Structure formats: structure tokens, C-alpha cells
């Protein structure tokens, strides 16, 4: 038996007209609150006083700034009992929550800019929820439940079927079978006292995009409604202050909206308040499933000690093990790049750039690539760099080189901004000198494994597609089985955010997810390489483990961050003199 506690704290951010994070739309601004947003935490301690902490936010993502700030305060509050390697911070990926919480430049651009009071509020909620959980530690049992949604439960659809069907290790699905082209299994940890369920942690992958970008209120979307529904039901059962965490698994290519013939027409019929109702229904499917499986006699009682490992790795130049790269001996990741498919968006969950402009981007990207690799540039010292970049990025039509801060081979402030306020804001920040040495997106990424008895949890940054996650689990499970691990689960959106992770085959399709897989076609292989190394260390006694414990993202230049810090102007983060 473990000693376990849980807590919940509201994220106190007032809607004041800033853009929300998720859709990347300048016009998607918050002017009200439909539901409250929360941080929910669980503290688990074993009989050797090892402490693991899981905290889930009703937010679009976790940023390094969030995690770093929370870790600093938790160290102060908990002292030596706090181990940042055993602290996992994740998010539900609702697209109707505040932005502006990152020190990197790109994902703050629509907000616009970095909003310190948002980061402070999120950090306060994290720390308060964790401290409530810590102070509530009591003897508690953990049961692992697992079940699949029936095929006729309209909870999720694959939104990138052509990419999914490229995988040789899947059952080929038709347009009418998109609801089967995903992992329909939910895994849930139930926390029991005196045989009664008091709290839970559910893992099921589906985008929190029931609510579109035309609404203007904060909302927890399907995962938030699932948590509220489960907590309400537990309260009716006499449980005091229950906590239900509905976190994400492989949500990358999974939509809560119908995909198939007539998908867009069907989506367009769900508008306004109907979107909130749709999100609530989707959440109810998830809460009903979790409560049903955890109300059954114990399927799998979790017992044993806690363990953990955390390491930050540079995904902009990572050599990939050949076994994960189709035998390729010289496979590398590269500087982060966004493709034309990223800017085009997804057809149902969130359209992006109009099709004619997206096609123009493709043409220009191909032209830039041809010129850079042509014989005319053979004496250019940059040629070697670009040969390696394009070898890594494969078929992606590169529009934004986030690493080198170029758009279609030109400076960031080169695109005309007269018709696009988002481009205008980027131009202003560039001209103000706010992004000279600051990263656009993260490249030093956290890989973490938590061990809870015979269960291992792979804590992954970003958004993994169904098969990318399945392959990662299949890679790590045989390694950890040698130390008695029976179940390996994956949680995504953990500890930082940098876009998507697709399989090599999915990447070749260059759908939205592949266009947003930043480090090239070997990105998944890099995760397999990195996680394999960490898993092998977990087999060793602690004193014999050899891995990088020191690398962390470099602090963003303070003077540049100040130049794009927003103190109340919803139109721009750049201060006018």
C-alpha cells in the first residue's frame, strides 16, 4: 500500500481579450469563462519515502517556463523530499484556455507575447494543488483498470487516415472506419481507501477540440467536462473532495469530431452553445468509461516501489539508432522546421491558411530547396548544412525554419503583414529586436519515465499519433519487463511542448501532423533512441546509472523576453516609445 493524496486548485486567470492557445488564431480571444480551469495533482509515496507527483492542467500545453517555475517553488515548499525527476506536469490540451505562458517566441505570437501574470497564476495553481495533495497523504491502494470503447460509441475518429494507412503495422481502414483507426482503449488508475474509489487518473487520447475557434470563453473542453462529471458522481457517493484527472495518451491524429464523408458539413452544424454541449457529451463518454472500469472488482492491483528518470536531450542534432531508422546508419534530426501542411491546418478541427496560399507556399518552398541544393551554391559554406537539413526533413515543404528564424529562406519580417495581424505582430517583434537570440520553439526536450510498482509511465512532450505512441511503447516494454514491469503506458503533452511526433511513414504523407513534426522524419526514431537509453538505465541500480542529468534549455535572453512581454495591450506585446 502507498500513501497517496490529491488536490485541485483553480487557475485564476481572468479573460481579458488575449488570444487563447491551440488554434493559433489571432481572432480566437477570451472574453469570458464557460467553465473553470483547474490544476489537479496526485502525490504518491512508497514505503521508502520516495515521492512521485503527477499534475494535470486544464491548459493547451505545458511549457518549460511553467515547469521550471513550479519546480523552484516546490523545492522551496517540500525541501529534499521533492525530486524534479519524479514530478510530471501534463495538460489536457484544451484549445479554450489562456496562452502567453512560454518564454519561447512562436507559440506566444497570437496572444500576443509573454504574459507574466498568466504564468504566475498557472504556477500558483500547480503548487497549491500539489501541496494540497501532499498534505492529504493517507494509506491508499492503486488499481489499474483497462477497457475499450465500443465501436459504436462516437467518441473519436482518426483525422489523418491516409497517413495512418501508410504504416505497415496497422489494419488498413476505409473512410467509414476512421473511428477504428486509433487506440480506443482507456487505461485508468483508481485510488482507493477502505475499498472505495476516491480519485482517478485516466489516459485516453483524443483532441480537446470539441469547441472551435469561433467561441470566446475559457472552457476545459471534453477532458474538463469528464473530470467535472466524475468528481460530481464521486461526491454523490459520499467521497469528500474527489479528484479526477483525465489526461492524454496518443491524441495526435485523433479528433473528437466525425471524420468521413460529409465531415465538414456535419461539423458546421455544431455551433455556439451546441459546441459546449458536444464537449460535455464527449467528456461524459470518457467519465462513464473510467468510472465503469474502476467500479469493477480489482483487475490489477499496483504494488511495489517508485522509481523515475528524467533527461533533457537536444532534438535539433540527435543521431538516431539505426534499428529505429529503417537501418539508416546516418540518420539525424535537425533544426526545427514547420512545413506548408502545418500552416494549412486540419480540415475539420481547425483550418489554417487558405488553400491557394498554402499551394503557393509549397511552390516557393520547393524553389528555395532547389536553389539551395543546386550546383550554383556548391561553394557556399551553407550548402553542407542544408544538405543535412533536407536529408533530415525529407519530403516536408519547409516554410518556417524556426531554428534559423527564416520564412521561405528569407528573414522573419519579410512577409507582408497588411492583411494578417499575426504576421504584423511577428514583424513588430523582429524589428524590436525581441527574437534575435531567443528560440522560436524548444529543441532541448524532456524525456521522463515514472515507475509505479509494476507500471511504467512514459511521459512525452508534444503530441504523439496513435502509431507513433504504439511503437514507442513496443520499444520500451521489452526493456523494462526485465525489471518486472508488466504495463507500459504513455502520457503525452508532458513537461514541454514542441508540436507533433509522427511515424516515419506518416511523415511521408505530410498531412498537418507531419508538417508539425519539427525535427524531421526521424523524430520518432529519436524518441525511441532516447527513451531506450533511459529505460536501460532503469534496469540498473541507481548508483550505476549513466545518463545526462545536467542538460537543460538555456535561459531565454532576459532583455529580449522583456521586449515581447505583454502588460495589458491585447493588440501587441511590443512597447511603443
Segments the model singles out, each with a brief description of its role:
Residues 1-577:
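Non-catalytic substrate/cofactor recognition surfaces at enzyme active-site rims
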